[in-house]
């Protein structure tokens, strides 16, 4: 959850009913509301194929709301955990092909089944969509967010499995929608998944020293679209040293949208002349803390669908990174289109 750079408090814009509505839509999209047909953006032919109807959608615009970003980042981490012993150090010039076949074979064999003894932490969990998806693999998932409103909503979703919200149309006008937890194994799996989740209010920059309060260390940690929206991102990284088990994974997805509105310039990770590109700066920061960056190519390919698989970002130095599309719908005709760089790190030494 974004914070104010001067105080570290939750940014006021995110503690509103409108923010809750937008994030419910992002975390729990339905078939009818993710594809644009509800707004007349797309028509279908007799075979049900989508055709454009007067709206030329940008590549990560309305057509890409189907990517369901919170579920996608969780799916990547679930698969990375299932193949963690096969993940190799990332090649600076690309991910290569060496172990892809082994990873794909493992994913087919294990089918990302539940690891009852494994624990996952979702830092900046918002309204809980990623946490519920992680709970399809991990025996315990703790979601932490600085927003009391978001955590209250996540707990309601945990109890009831659904919640009504409003999609704005014009000003105060809008229509009622329903957010639902939709486990990949079907509605019957909801109770078991919900029971594995625990949602708590907490500051992402103040997790250091909280291992005991959180019940011990974690096998996997998700940090999704958070680093560039907190006042002290390095404190988030510092906490990972004690929060993550040896050989545990940290999956970080970030658009690196650095702004002094949220983060003082001196706290940015990359984004300055002296530091260079943020993905490389983050890699260096994680190296200092005992984490090595690992290859995600086969894992991302298994989690994503066409045409998103080919989305890559190349740094000035030529290093390639997968980017994951995220679309936040503000109202019927306005979308935030975000491409988050995906990086995964394995802890290589004990703290």
What is each model feature region?
Residues 61-116:
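Conserved alpha-helix/loop element of class I SAM-dependent methyltransferases that forms part
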Residues 116-126, 142, 251-287:
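Conserved class I S-adenosyl-L-methionine
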Residues 202-221:
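A short acidic, Gly/Pro-enriched loop at the edge of an enzyme's catalytic core
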Residues 127-137:
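Conserved SAM-binding loop of SAM-dependent methyltransferases across substrates and taxa
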Residues 147:
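Conserved SAM/SAH-binding beta-strand->alpha-helix loop
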Residues 234-246:
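A short glycine-rich, Lys/Arg-flanked "PGG" loop and its adjoining helix->strand segment in the class I
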Residues 159-207:
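S-adenosyl-L-methionine
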